[in-house]
Design a protein with these regions (language model features):
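RNA-binding accessory domains that recognize and position tRNA/RNA substrates
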Residues: 1-134
Length: 134
């Protein structure tokens, strides 16, 4: 899928559940991800989700520099890794996400291929230029 990036310091539950990221590999540039876990999926009386954009993860994968297995937040109900595993979404760590973001900014749209053995294992990403012309 297409590799995209997000420069927000927090809000990965909202970003991952945003339908606009459907099928894309989301690169998070903030250096530490997962340290506040994942909040519960709740809906307000008006029908709007409280901590997420929808009830499922739309991104096809998440790419982070450093994943924190330890999480601590008053509202967290599970770790990011547990949530991704439950939703069958691969997580990739050990990538220089800021350098990857520079490449994406300089070269534009890029497609990727991921190969992994288990959730949050250091792997290689093979980036190729998209056949789509601007």
């Amino acid at each position: 899928g297409e590799v995209v990036f997000n420069t927000a310091m927090m809000g990965y539950p909202e970003s991952l559940t945003d339908p606009s990221y459907a099928g894309q590999l989301m690169t998070l540039t903030y250096p530490l991800v997962g340290n506040y876990g994942v909040p519960p999926f709740t809906v307000e009386k008006n029908g709007i989700a409280t901590f997420m954009e929808s009830d499922k993860i739309y991104a096809s994968a998440i790419i982070v520099a450093d994943y924190s297995e330890q999480y601590c937040h008053w509202n967290a109900v599970e770790s990011l890794a547990d949530w991704l595993k439950r939703e069958h979404v691969p997580g990739i760590t050990g990538i220089d996400t800021r350098e990857l973001t520079k490449v994406l900014r300089e070269h534009g749209l890029m497609m990727s291929q991921t190969m992994y053995r288990k959730l949050f294992t250091k792997v290689s990403i093979s980036l190729t230029r998209s056949a789509v012309r601007r």
